[in-house]
Amino acid sequence: MGQKIRKCKNCGRYTLREICPVCGGKPFSPNPARFSPKDPYGRYRRMAKKG
């Protein structure tokens, strides 16, 4: 019962399935990663995001 909603990378539609029913793409979890103040790699992730 614990299904999570997913968002397709190709078409951007939301689904509960493992494969997008519209385009056949692979959906991913649209939720961001959980925040932790003790994140050892947070500094590098923010630097990569800035470019």
Swiss-Prot record:
Keywords: Ribonucleoprotein, Ribosome biogenesis, rRNA processing. GO terms for biological process: pseudouridine synthesis; rRNA processing. GO terms for molecular function: snoRNA binding. It comes from the Archaea. GO terms for cellular component: ribonucleoprotein complex. Belongs to the NOP10 family. Involved in ribosome biogenesis; more specifically in 18S rRNA pseudouridylation and in cleavage of pre-rRNA. This is Ribosome biogenesis protein Nop10. It comes from Methanosarcina barkeri (strain Fusaro / DSM 804). The gene is nop10.
